[in-house]
């Protein structure tokens, strides 16, 4: 069977490829073929502009011949004995590998990964992989993800599994060695550490190797999931394992999260995926406000704790306390030599700026979590930041019942009212934030405002105001 390729007339880069049977039987492809053939295009490889060349190739791999022209004969024969000087099949990867520093391109060639896919991605400046849906697998209710290949002549699509990482991403060396052995045995020999969702991904597993690979992964004590319309793998900051600013035990809460919601993590039941992130303080090292459908942020309600001796010692060592006070968003800090640092509790916004800058200032003791919802980077209406659902809840372990009951109530509202494949942020935007708060049973409070109002003109009906003397 004959194949028809539309390629760049200058560099020969193939833009699209069809079979003669497809052009004869599929009107959609025939129409696109005529459209591309008759228009001027820009080659993504050499950036040359012009009409595409119609090249026809026999299925058996015969010589390529441009339509309407004979194949050009070579003016000179190739010298005998110089085959070793042929052009490298991966020139751009070779260029990356040059130099005295280690190169990922060099290491990639040592694995089973089809390096021509990466070479073509470098040349075209875009990935040659795409989303290919799911593969059903017994024992994995959410399915296994498939990466579709845009270049089937190089390689077919490949599967990859997402492994739920332990709290804090603390892997033992024995567990990591076991995962590396599984990757070498069943896949490309590559581990993705870690994805933007906090997963460990095992790449390039052929369909026939999926079952034994998953069985060996689970035998190491790991769960497979984070696909489909369920709770995706939650991500948390390292919290009390290293940071002294954390306002609750992020690692303990995440462990309790999986005990409470493990079924919803492994069995899809929501209108769309739900990403959850846990930050120990408003610094938000996990970017939960930008990316999480459900975001638990550590907060405190009283004034920061000030160790006057540490602050004075820091100032004596050259600390610029004047600049810190002037840049406080709430203008709540005042420094007086000899009297120390004073913080106005009513003006404090609890933003962590002073705690980040001054060693002697630490968060207050009235601590808990704020529940925010609706953050995302993609979706129907584009990026959105999270909105406050509940401004403060005490995070009391080990089961964190009050926090999880609030989240469960919210997910019931989302499950009952959202449309299919509608993210949480898109759902809130469609019905309106006021209607969403009513459905969730949230009492209005100043902390729920997105921003202060700028229009000070107000209108009200007499019946809306109890004290008529205010009219």
Question: Language-model segments: which ranges?
Answer:
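Short metal-binding segments enriched for Cys and/or His
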Residues: 35-61, 356-364
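Flexible, glycine/charged-enriched surface loops at secondary-structure junctions
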Residues: 188-194, 227-229, 267-273, 335-338, ...
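Charge-rich, low-complexity segments
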Residues: 65-147
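Iron-sulfur cluster-binding cysteine motifs and their immediate structural context
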Residues: 293, 322-343, 347-370
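Small-residue-enriched alpha-helical segments and adjacent helix-cap loops
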Residues: 94, 132-137, 159-318, 467-471
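Short cysteine-rich clusters marking metal-coordination/redox-active sites
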Residues: 8-11, 43-46, 328, 348, ...
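Short Cys/His-rich "knuckle" micro-motifs
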Residues: 18-21, 53-57, 289, 336-338
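Short linker/helix segments within small regulatory modules
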Residues: 22-41, 336-343
